């Protein structure tokens, strides 16, 4: 059994993986939006996740060969459910981006930081550490301030994005349940990506005429979203969630809004308002208290256990 110190190191490493996911997703937000100028949302989802599947599949094969314990028979079925939640979240987010701003989408997507602990209580009857609630509220406030402290008038795209946040929260919760039980984070990633690729391409073939010129024009965005945002980003999420709770993971993943703003300043010459910098500080503070307070308030008998 790992020592208390080893558990702390593992959890810190897990949260670093989740921060990396947030950074990669934040950088990919603009790509997701600009791709819609050339290609439909369904084909974009299908193609990006086809690339992500190609990234994850060799890792899943390596993982299978190295595994010491057999995988529960129900794991593939559970992974398929995660894939459906991921597809629903990706689809509603992309459809929302057709009619809402990147700012609104970034903030409303961040609602999952509140939805995750809510779903955990409703469906799993698990109460997260009390600090998760104020930390989630702080993270949401920080995202709001980062968006300039205001939202443009809500439209249909905004409501789709709120639905997206519910599906993201469901995906985070399901990953938190099943990645530990299966011990196969790479296979989980491969299966959920495959579900999104198949459903996206199938729906695209039915509802969106495929234009190879449009695909060529959107290729840089598709490649980034496929390899980095989907492939690397979601793999880091799944690996990180093996060693932390879903509500805590949601707080660290919400850093995508922070990284989107900071990378916009560094790479695109965008500006952050003074209120936005306060938002950055609030998000960072939320992550710190979510990491530190549960450890400081842990009963001594647990903290001292080997």
State what each model feature region is.
Residues 1-46, 84, 92, 150-177, ...:
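Glycine-/small-residue-enriched transmembrane alpha-helix faces in small-molecule transporters
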Residues 2-4, 9, 48-49, 57, ...:
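C-terminal-most transmembrane helix of multi-pass membrane proteins
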Residues 12-17, 43-58, 81, 134-138, ...:
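Hydrophobic alpha-helical transmembrane segments of multi-pass integral membrane proteins
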Residues 24, 28-29, 57-109, 145, ...:
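Specific transmembrane alpha-helical segments of multi-pass solute transporters/efflux pumps
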Residues 26, 30, 57, 83, ...:
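Hydrophobic/small/kink-forming positions within alpha-helical transmembrane segments
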Residues 45-47, 105-112, 175-197, 230-266:
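Helix-helix packing/entry segments at the starts of transmembrane helices
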Residues 55-63, 93, 112-134, 258-278:
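C-terminal transmembrane-helix exit sites in multi-pass transporters
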Residues 56, 128-148, 164-168, 198-201, ...:
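Hydrophobic transmembrane alpha-helices of multi-pass small-molecule transport proteins
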């Amino acid at each position: 059994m790992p020592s208390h110190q080893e558990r702390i190191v593992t959890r810190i490493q897990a949260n670093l993986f989740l921060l990396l996911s947030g950074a990669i997703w934040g950088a990919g937000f603009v790509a997701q939006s600009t791709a819609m100028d050339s290609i439909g949302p369904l084909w974009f989802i299908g193609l990006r996740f086809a690339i992500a599947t190609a990234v994850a599949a060799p890792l899943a094969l390596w993982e299978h060969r190295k595994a010491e314990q057999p995988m529960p028979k129900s794991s593939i079925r559970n992974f398929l459910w995660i894939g459906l939640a991921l597809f629903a979240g990706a689809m509603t987010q992309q459809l929302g981006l057709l009619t809402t701003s990147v700012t609104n989408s970034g903030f409303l997507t961040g609602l999952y930081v509140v939805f995750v602990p809510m779903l955990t209580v409703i469906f799993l009857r698990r109460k997260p550490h009390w600090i998760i609630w104020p930390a989630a509220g702080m993270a949401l406030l920080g995202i709001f301030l980062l968006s300039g402290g205001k939202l443009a008038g809500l439209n249909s795209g905004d409501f789709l994005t709120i639905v997206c946040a519910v599906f993201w929260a469901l995906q985070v919760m399901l990953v938190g349940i099943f990645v530990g039980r299966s011990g196969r984070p790479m296979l989980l990633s491969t299966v959920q990506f495959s579900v999104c690729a198949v459903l996206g391409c199938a729906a695209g073939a039915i509802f969106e005429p495929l234009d190879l010129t449009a695909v060529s024009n959107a290729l840089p965005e598709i490649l980034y979203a496929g390899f980095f945002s989907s492939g690397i980003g979601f793999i880091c999420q799944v690996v990180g969630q093996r060693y932390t709770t879903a509500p805590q993971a949601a707080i660290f993943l919400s850093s995508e809004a922070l990284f989107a703003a900071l990378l916009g300043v560094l790479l695109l010459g965008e500006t952050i308002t003074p209120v936005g910098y306060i938002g950055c500080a609030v998000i960072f503070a939320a992550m710190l208290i979510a990491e530190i307070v549960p450890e400081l308030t842990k009963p001594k008998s647990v903290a001292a256990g080997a």
